[in-house]
């Protein structure tokens, strides 16, 4: 019986940071196969792709196993949702037309089995924290900037995007080991009191006490934290280190990993 709702994020498919990108994709496809008979809906909460840009007639190569499995589940009646992350912000209508997916460019508040969820990738909430990121956020979502980018041949843009992503992640890992961690990447170095998504959830919950659960991706952290009055905030981890996801069965919301199923 299809009764469970799943949430996952940050697979970064195609990333050169993965020791073996194909292994990551196969693992993700295997997870989808395992949950196919129980899944009522699946929410992919951003950065499932390390880079994604849709031209009018062209999309990035690869991801065949993942997209094929998602298409199978959609055809079987599973509700599919994709959120734009900061790496795959340039989604348009491909996933909707080919997979029947609901695409969300911003966070949403939705009722699921009687509880109210605030769902977002997590990058949008950083705009109020750092002005430079707010400028970058606006630039990446600017229609003119997108039009100009689309005018450049993919031969140049795809390699450049993957290269910038890899450099950014390596730089973040280096800062982490020095104790300077604007991007935490790892629970081992995580300061929960200063995490902006935790602060956002606390502040938002004070203004919107009707929200029961907050679920984010983006930070590559595994977090399940209690707020006031039995409210909770979850950060989903990733498919780089944790192979993790959350599942809601209408009564219980838990963080799990692919290894828990083996």
UniProtKB/Swiss-Prot annotation:
This is UDP-2,3-diacylglucosamine hydrolase. It is an enzyme of class 3 (hydrolase). Its main location: membrane. Keywords: Cell inner membrane, Cell membrane, Cytoplasm, Hydrolase, Manganese, Membrane, Metal-binding. The keyword Calcium does not apply. Mn(2+) 2 binds at residues 47, 86, 121, 218. Mn(2+) 1 binds at residues 10, 12, 47, 220. It comes from Porphyromonas gingivalis (strain ATCC BAA-308 / W83). Induction: Induced by oxidative stress due to hydrogen peroxide.
């Amino acid at each position: 019986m299809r009764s469970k709702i799943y949430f996952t994020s940050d697979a970064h498919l195609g990333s050169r940071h993965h020791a073996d990108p194909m292994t990551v994709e196969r693992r993700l496809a295997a997870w989808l196969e395992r949950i196919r008979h129980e899944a009522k809906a699946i929410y992919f909460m951003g950065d499932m792709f390390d880079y994604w840009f849709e031209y009018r007639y062209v999309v990035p190569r690869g991801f065949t196993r993942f997209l094929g499995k998602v298409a199978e589940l959609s055809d079987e009646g599973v509700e599919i949702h994709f959120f734009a992350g900061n790496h795959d912000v340039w989604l348009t209508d491909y996933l909707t037309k080919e997979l029947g997916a609901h695409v969300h460019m911003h966070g949403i508040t939705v009722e699921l089995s009687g509880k109210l969820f605030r769902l977002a990738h997590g990058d949008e909430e950083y705009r109020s924290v750092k002005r430079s990121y707010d400028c970058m956020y606006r630039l990446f979502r600017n229609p003119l900037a997108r039009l100009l980018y689309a005018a450049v041949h993919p031969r140049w843009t795809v390699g450049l995007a993957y290269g910038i992503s890899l450099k950014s992640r390596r730089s973040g890992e280096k800062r982490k080991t020095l104790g300077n961690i604007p991007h935490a990447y790892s629970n081992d170095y995580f300061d929960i009191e200063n995490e902006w998504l935790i602060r956002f959830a606390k502040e938002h919950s004070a203004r919107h006490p009707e929200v029961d659960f907050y679920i984010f991706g983006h930070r590559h952290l595994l977090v399940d934290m209690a707020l006031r009055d039995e409210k909770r905030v979850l950060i989903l981890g990733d498919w780089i280190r944790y192979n993790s996801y959350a599942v809601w069965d209408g009564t219980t919301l838990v963080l799990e990993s692919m290894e828990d199923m083996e």
